[in-house]
């Protein structure tokens, strides 16, 4: 089972505009200790928006 100290945990990316959680991905905690922020397409907004890691 996955532990809380997993090196590559699953994270969800939420749109900064509409706050919908649209994407699930993995990240490497050693390379990206801060919250991940990517520009992805938001199907709810219909445009490319900034998506940020949410809990």
Curated annotation (Swiss-Prot):
Q: Check the record and name the SUPFAM superfamilies matching this protein.
A: Zn-binding ribosomal proteins (SSF57829)
One Pfam family here: Ribosomal_L33
Which keywords does this chain's UniProt record carry?
Ribonucleoprotein, Ribosomal protein
What are this entry's molecular-function GO terms?
structural constituent of ribosome
Q: Which GO terms describe its cellular component?
A: cytoplasm; ribonucleoprotein complex; ribosome
InterPro entries in alphabetical order: Ribosomal_bL33 (IPR001705), Ribosomal_bL33_CS (IPR018264), Ribosomal_bL33_sf (IPR038584), Ribosomal_zn-bd (IPR011332)
**Could you tell me the Gene Ontology terms of the biological process aspect for this record?**
translation
Superkingdom of origin: Bacteria
Query: PANTHER family under this entry?
Result: 50S RIBOSOMAL PROTEIN L33, CHLOROPLASTIC (PTHR43168), LARGE RIBOSOMAL SUBUNIT PROTEIN BL33C (PTHR43168:SF2)
What is the similarity comment for this entry?
Belongs to the bacterial ribosomal protein bL33 family.
| Full protein name | Large ribosomal subunit protein bL33A
| UniProt gene name | rpmG1
């Amino acid at each position: 089972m996955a532990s809380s100290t997993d090196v590559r945990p699953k994270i969800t990316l939420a749109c900064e505009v509409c706050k919908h959680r649209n994407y699930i991905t993995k990240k490497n905690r050693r390379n990206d200790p801060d919250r991940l922020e990517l520009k992805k397409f938001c199907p709810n907004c219909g445009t490319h928006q900034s998506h940020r890691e949410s809990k």
